[in-house]
Amino acid sequence: MKSFEHLEKALELLFDQKAINKTNPKGIAHANSLIASGDVKEPSSWEHPTAEMENAYLEANGWDEFSKWYLGVDTEMGAETKGHYGYVYTSDFKTVDRQGLRAIRQRAAQNGMTSIFAAAGKMIEKIDAKK
């Protein structure tokens, strides 16, 4: 079972890198708002939310709220599909995860998404400035 969970997580990360082709203004605004209010987590490692966590959050809050936790979108996919969203910056749907932003920068650089790379970098700078 454990190896299946690792495979599932690897596939989620692979799909997260799919065809994200645009920044998500709602996600960027929400992340900046959380950073301004101090709702930031600084764990030593990054944990992508599980599919179960995503599904539970989506069922409880709907697509509009779900969309706020992602810095990028794939405009080729419907807005009410998980495939539409990428570059998640939270591990708990409550806080901005600093290590998640670092992971986003790395993936965005690999995928040539300079606007997402820059947005995540500015967020990290804001977090670090509050220390």
Regions found by a protein language model. Name each.
Residues 2-131:
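Extended terminal accessory/targeting regions
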